[in-house]
Amino acid sequence: MADCHISLHWDGDGLNYDKGSFYISVPDSVKGMEPVASHWTQHNALGASLVDGLRAQGCKINGGGSMSIDLTQTSYSTIPSVDMELGNACSNHSDETLNIQAEGLLRGINAYYGR
């Protein structure tokens, strides 16, 4: 079994500007249901660590770094699981930028696991 699940996305939202990165947090409406109730804090902690890692690398962060949406793939997972939005179609997708984002995500993973 995997230690965690991180799904990487760039929104196709039609915006004409780079909105930055954020993670999809677990909404209050499902936090009381199992298996969500037993695992949502892990999901949100992983997401927050990833955003902190991206921020430390100088990546643009959208708002407070999270948006609450009920996603079955993450909310109902029994391992730490998060959907990371790394920008959109207007974001810089150069190798340099992707490497910076990769370093930020690695930094966040290491922080989450106390490395």
Regions found by a protein language model. Give the residues of each.
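Active-site-proximal helix/loop segments of hydrolytic enzymes
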Residues: 1-115
